[in-house]
Amino acid sequence: MAPASQSTYQKDERVLCFHHEILYEAKILDVRHTNAEDKKSPFEYLVHYKGWKNTWDDWVPQDRLRKFTDENRELATTLRREAEAAFRQKSTKTTLKRKAGSDRGSARDSEERQTSVPGRVTKRARDNEIEKEEHFYTRPSVRIVMPDNLKSLLVDDWENVTKNQQVVALPAKASVNQILEDFVAEEKPKRTSSADLDVLEEVIMGIKEYFDKALDKILLYRFEREQYKALRKKWEAGSGEYSEKGPLDVYGAEHLTRLFATMPELIAQTNMDLQSTNRLREELSKFTLWLSKNSDKYFATRYMTATNEYVEKSRGNPSAAATAATTRLV
């Protein structure tokens, strides 16, 4: 880690720099303190984006820069593809919306001309609702990178549980806590400043908190709830192998990946600014790319087939043997 008196990035260094949501290759032209009279003030960097006109040269804070490593280049490529896909999707929706609007235009104009005062009040109320909805959708969104193999694993996971009536064997072979600890251990040496380390720690803490609160509310399929109830009794009792354990120690990669699939909707309900949103997206995307590369290590290779008694209980038809059946599953 560079000392406070030394800049993390040097003049003429090749780097990657964020411009809005995308990382671009750039070169550092100059380095200075944000306050020339205070040598302890943060550094800022004059960057030139490769292939761009000099008029785009800009002084940027350190948190917009990334080292020019293979890992960060892969992230830059992935973020660009995600942004291009989102732009194409948005363009398609806009075109369809305009076409539908023009088709309804004359009829709507005629209707509004014939509407009385009460109708105008209704229209105003409708416009207010539309304005609220548009405000919601203009909040910074977090398009987390979800590699194809993780998407495929999510589909298989859904089919195993909902169609095949199977459940993941729990405790998982690698818990959520263990997976996150492994990621941090590998990621820490790459963090060149205390600020970057602080961000990493905050994000990991946030993931744990989200998982803990979201598990029984949105991450479980209905068929898994009986298994969850049985496990919860064990860790709340705090006896045996479940002593001082909780969801983060019992569940693993399958349910953690489900969380990341729902994370954009969860974050959309917060009031983060664009800069914070972009940084969070970068951190979460780094994790999904890492998990994708290590999927063989963390995901279950097989699911457990539920007993008939468990199936009946999951449908709300308890039987005398159901409790024992649930216990055998966990």
Swiss-Prot record:
Residues 86-125 are annotated as: Disordered. InterPro entries: Chromo-like_dom_sf, Chromo/chromo_shadow_dom, MRG, MRG_C_sf, MRG_dom, MSL3_chromo-like. One of its GO terms (biological process) is chromatin remodeling. Residues 13-66 form the Tudor-knot domain. It holds the Pfam family MRG. GO terms for cellular component: NuA4 histone acetyltransferase complex; Rpd3S complex. Residues 138-315 form the MRG domain. Belongs to the MRG family. Involved in deacetylation of histones, chromatin assembly and chromosome segregation. May act as a transcriptional oscillator, directing histone deacetylases to specific chromosomal domains. Component of the NuA4 histone acetyltransferase complex which is involved in transcriptional activation of selected genes principally by acetylation of nucleosomal histone H4 and H2A. The NuA4 complex is also involved in DNA repair. Component of the NuA4 histone acetyltransferase complex. This is Chromatin modification-related protein eaf3. The gene is eaf3.
